[in-house]
Curated annotation (Swiss-Prot):
<keyword id="KW-0677">Repeat</keyword>
<keyword id="KW-0147">Chitin-binding</keyword>
<dbReference type="InterPro" id="IPR001002">
    <property type="entry name" value="Chitin-bd_1"/>
</dbReference>
<protein>
    <recommendedName>
        <fullName>Lectin-A</fullName>
    </recommendedName>
</protein>
<dbReference type="InterPro" id="IPR036861">
    <property type="entry name" value="Endochitinase-like_sf"/>
</dbReference>
<keyword id="KW-0325">Glycoprotein</keyword>
<dbReference type="GO" id="GO:0045840">
    <property type="term" value="P:positive regulation of mitotic nuclear division"/>
</dbReference>
<dbReference type="GO" id="GO:0030246">
    <property type="term" value="F:carbohydrate binding"/>
</dbReference>
<keyword id="KW-0430">Lectin</keyword>
<feature type="domain" description="Chitin-binding type-1 2">
    <location>
        <begin position="22"/>
        <end position="45"/>
    </location>
</feature>
<comment type="function">
    <text>N-acetyl-D-glucosamine binding lectin. Shows low hemagglutinating activity towards human erythrocytes. Has low mitogenic activity towards human peripheral blood lymphocytes.</text>
</comment>
<keyword id="KW-0348">Hemagglutinin</keyword>
<feature type="domain" description="Chitin-binding type-1 1">
    <location>
        <begin position="1"/>
        <end position="20"/>
    </location>
</feature>
<dbReference type="GO" id="GO:0051781">
    <property type="term" value="P:positive regulation of cell division"/>
</dbReference>
<dbReference type="GO" id="GO:0008061">
    <property type="term" value="F:chitin binding"/>
</dbReference>
<keyword id="KW-0497">Mitogen</keyword>
<dbReference type="Pfam" id="PF00187">
    <property type="entry name" value="Chitin_bind_1"/>
</dbReference>
Amino acid sequence: APECGREAHCGDDCQSQVVTRDFDDRTCPKLLCCSKDGWCGNTDANWRCGVDFGRTCPNDLCCS
């Protein structure tokens, strides 16, 4: 799973809440971590979203 950092978001519906630089898995599951680099994820896996992230993974699992 990607590391959450500054300006990272988490949430499986992308109604995402901002998490702090000191990521805490009590705030959100690491597998639902999204960052400005375009990570998307579900409870099974994380993978990198490309520019066309809507075609790479479901929109409801993506943040940008």
